[in-house]
Swiss-Prot record:
Pfam families: Ribosomal_S9. This is Small ribosomal subunit protein uS9. GO terms for molecular function: RNA binding; structural constituent of ribosome. InterPro entries: Ribosomal_Su5_D2-typ_SF (IPR020568), Ribosomal_uS9 (IPR000754), Ribosomal_uS9_bac/plastid (IPR023035), Ribosomal_uS9_CS (IPR020574), Ribsml_uS5_D2-typ_fold_subgr (IPR014721). Transmembrane segments: none annotated. The gene is rpsI. Gene3D superfamilies: 3.30.230.10. NCBIfam families: PRK00132.1. Signal peptide: none annotated. It comes from Shigella sonnei (strain Ss046). One of its GO terms (biological process) is translation. PROSITE patterns: RIBOSOMAL_S9 (PS00360). GO terms for cellular component: cytosolic small ribosomal subunit. Belongs to the universal ribosomal protein uS9 family.
Length: 130
């Protein structure tokens, strides 16, 4: 591959994304498909583009991404985290700007496990007094 390529790993919920960045003209490829083909929802596309728009690099970099696991929002969040890490590897001076926007911190929230005797993680069975 390219010699001037930068890499970042992103994770969110049950998703993990590997992001490769190289100078180009703004092409985003996710699992061999375009951004528009991969994410049907506009909100997911916006989440993916956020770090690039913040640092004005939308038209300057090509992104090659592989993502596994989780659902749509988890994958979009993992990609955003991966892009952020790759951008910091590309140019360390972008870190403070990305940190201010909250993209550097890994969102550690996970689905809470279902407990025995409950219907869901916290939802109790209906209580009948009589």
């Amino acid at each position: 591959m390219a010699e001037n390529q930068y890499y970042g790993t992103g994770r969110r919920k049950n998703s993990a994304a590997r992001v490769f960045i190289k100078p180009g003209n703004g092409k985003i490829v996710i699992n061999q498909r375009s951004l528009e083909q991969y994410f049907g929802r506009e909100t997911a596309r916006m989440v993916v583009r956020q770090p690039l728009e913040l640092v004005d690099m939308v038209e300057k970099l090509d992104l090659y991404i592989t993502v596994k696991g989780g659902g749509i929002s988890g994958q979009a969040g993992a990609i955003r985290h991966g892009i952020t890490r790759a951008l910091m590897e590309y140019d360390e001076s972008l870190r403070s700007e990305l940190r201010k926007a909250g993209f550097v911190t890994r969102d550690a929230r996970q689905v809470e496990r279902k407990k025995v005797g409950l219907r869901k993680a916290r939802r109790r069975p209906q209580f009948s007094k009589r």
